[in-house]
């Protein structure tokens, strides 16, 4: 039974071809939304605060400031509702979790941009 679950998870992971990103990067996540009978794509852009889990259950938490208010949104990375992930800007941080961004707004909520080569590992 455990083998069957592992095989299904591996099959799901092989389908996905996600762009490599890390905590501190600013990414744009496009998701499928069903409004009434219509299906449309909604884009959410924010700074990656945390990546949790692994395998098919891996999640990412994004932080963004809009209209002076901070908001967070979590996404399952391997969900069929996610259309695509695009890295907008690379961030330079020294932490694995950026929860200190929660109460910050304006310039204090910014992450320095990383300029230079980045290794291919996650």
Curated annotation (Swiss-Prot):
Cellular component per GO, a single term: cytosolic large ribosomal subunit
Entry-linked NCBIfam families: rplS_bact
Family: Belongs to the bacterial ribosomal protein bL19 family.
HAMAP family for this protein: Ribosomal_bL19
Protein name: Large ribosomal subunit protein bL19
Source organism (scientific name): Chlamydia felis (strain Fe/C-56)
Cited InterPro entries: Ribosomal_bL19 (IPR001857), Ribosomal_bL19_CS (IPR018257), Ribosomal_bL19_sf (IPR038657), Translation_prot_SH3-like_sf (IPR008991)
Domain of life: Bacteria
One Pfam family, short name: Ribosomal_L19
This protein's record includes keyword Ribosomal protein: yes
Role, per record: This protein is located at the 30S-50S ribosomal subunit interface and may play a role in the structure and function of the aminoacyl-tRNA binding site.
PANTHER family according to UniProt: LARGE RIBOSOMAL SUBUNIT PROTEIN BL19M, RIBOSOMAL PROTEIN L19
Alphabetical UniProt keywords: Ribonucleoprotein, Ribosomal protein
Record flagged with keyword Ribonucleoprotein: yes
SUPFAM superfamilies: Translation proteins SH3-like domain
Gene Ontology molecular function: any one: structural constituent of ribosome
Entry's Gene Ontology BP terms: translation
């Amino acid at each position: 039974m455990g083998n069957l679950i592992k095989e299904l998870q591996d099959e799901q992971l092989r389908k996905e071809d996600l762009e490599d990103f890390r905590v501190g990067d600013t990414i744009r996540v496009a998701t499928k939304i069903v409004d009434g009978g219509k299906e449309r794509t909604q884009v959410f852009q924010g700074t990656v605060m945390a990546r949790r889990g692994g395998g098919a259950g891996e999640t990412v938490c994004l932080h963004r400031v809009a209209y002076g208010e901070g908001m967070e949104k979590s996404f399952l990375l391997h969900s069929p509702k996610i259309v695509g992930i695009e890295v907008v800007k690379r961030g330079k941080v020294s932490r694995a979790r950026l929860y200190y961004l929660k109460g910050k707004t304006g310039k204090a909520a910014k992450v320095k941009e990383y300029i230079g080569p980045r290794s291919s590992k996650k």
